[in-house]
């Protein structure tokens, strides 16, 4: 692709201070640590960012907890945001009453990477205040959690000036960067070893034949042996970091056991050659999973160090009350209508009706609903009533009671 460069400037590299250095510097400047905001705790809904790096970062609905905000037992409300891809970011505006060092507490859910953690980088006013802010961890748990921004060892405070500030959450690999690089190097070397052995054995080796691997391809055998040692080290380090043996760590241990067996005994290579290839593929899948950093966020708060954390999980009575209201509402809710935003400036004359066939799915209807509310209605002043239907579109049109707009799948034909 063509590119035009007008100017190149070189700057000296300046490393960010550690958190201890950052904290000592701010305290020496007379900036105080905010202990309590009390009722003045600032809450920012994650589904309402000021800026996003990519259009695929959009709010979604979550009904797994009655505490998720905003929540409704019958209606679908966009109340969380889910980001997974590295280098994507979301920025929010935060206004604080005074200069100081504040904590940032997040209500989140990380239930995708079992036994692992995902990472985020937090920028304040587009600046990384200290090194550890690039490795904010969110550990695995099947339910919702609340935690102050931390690196797994200590909680952090961030400097915010009086008035408006920006807080940016960027998806990063964090402490997983080194492990991703090491596994990537292993996959390359193991693929090379596999190709060397494949030249001797063919795709389906004879399990009872002596191929002389140690004599003909000693480097390939040594590569497998070294890979086993490296995988054991990575698994042990990850288990030490996370404090538990999750699926990702167990996968590495399982692969390492086979590699160790093949590396120590060349007669085990041919019988396990097909499995060896599949385990290289499994390592690639592990790498792909590690490159994704899924995290669902409900909201975050800017608060004092002594302010209580946001409530993460609802109690029994809150949960059962929410489910009862949802059950009762199911008897009178109109599930065919994808509701529209009401606004007094829009009249009935400026309203059109749109029917969507169920073959396209409710997800498509929600996407269309979001596009209409975000772009079409504000620009045109026309609201759209949307309904998801199963059958009867042709009959309704022939009877003269059809919609203004119909969105059909390829199997629906009207002549």
Residue ranges and their predicted role:
Residues 275-347:
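Extracytoplasmic ectodomains of secretory-pathway proteins
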Residues 347-361, 376, 382-387, 405:
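Short, well-ordered beta-strand elements
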Residues 114, 360, 364, 368, ...:
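Extracytoplasmic/periplasmic, Sec-exported soluble proteins
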Residues 1-302:
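Extracytoplasmic
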């Amino acid at each position: 692709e063509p590119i035009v460069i007008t100017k190149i400037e070189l700057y000296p590299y300046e490393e960010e201070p550690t958190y201890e250095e950052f904290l000592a510097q701010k305290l020496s400047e007379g900036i105080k640590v905010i202990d309590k905001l009390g009722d003045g705790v600032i809450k920012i809904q994650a589904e309402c960012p000021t800026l996003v790096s990519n259009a695929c970062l959009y709010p979604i609905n979550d009904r797994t907890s009655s505490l998720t905000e905003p929540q409704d037992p019958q209606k679908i409300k966009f109340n969380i945001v889910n980001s997974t891809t590295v280098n994507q970011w979301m920025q929010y505006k935060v206004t604080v009453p005074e200069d100081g060092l504040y904590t940032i507490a997040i209500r989140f859910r990380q239930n995708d990477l079992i036994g692992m953690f995902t990472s985020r980088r937090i920028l304040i006013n587009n600046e990384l205040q200290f090194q550890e802010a690039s490795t904010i961890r969110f550990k695995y748990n099947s339910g919702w959690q609340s935690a102050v921004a931390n690196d797994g060892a200590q909680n952090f405070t961030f400097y915010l000036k009086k008035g408006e500030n920006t807080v940016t959450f960027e998806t990063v690999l964090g402490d997983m960067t080194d492990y991703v690089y090491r596994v990537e190097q292993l996959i390359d070397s193991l693929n090379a070893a596999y190709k060397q052995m494949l030249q001797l054995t063919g795709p389906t080796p004879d399990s009872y034949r002596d191929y002389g691997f140690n004599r003909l391809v000693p480097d390939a055998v040594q590569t497998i042996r070294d890979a086993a040692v490296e995988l054991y080290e990575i698994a042990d380090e990850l288990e030490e970091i996370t404090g538990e043996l999750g699926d990702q760590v167990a996968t590495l241990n399982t692969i390492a056991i086979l590699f160790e067996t093949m590396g120590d005994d060349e007669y085990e290579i041919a019988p396990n050659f097909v499995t060896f290839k599949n385990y290289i593929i499994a390592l690639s899948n592990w790498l792909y999973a590690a490159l994704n950093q899924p995290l669902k966020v409900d909201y975050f708060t800017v608060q004092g160090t002594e302010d209580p954390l946001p409530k993460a999980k609802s109690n029994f009575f809150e949960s059962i009350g929410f489910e009862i209201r949802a059950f009762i509402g199911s008897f009178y809710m109109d599930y065919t209508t994808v509701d529209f935003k009401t606004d007094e400036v829009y009249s009935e004359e400026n309203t059109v009706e749109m029917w969507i066939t169920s073959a396209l799915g409710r997800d498509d209807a929600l996407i269309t609903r979001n596009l209409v509310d975000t772009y079409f209605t504000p620009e045109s002043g026309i609201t759209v009533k949307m309904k998801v239907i199963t059958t009867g579109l042709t009959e309704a049109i022939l009877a003269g009671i059809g919609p203004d707009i119909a969105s059909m799948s390829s199997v629906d034909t009207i002549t």
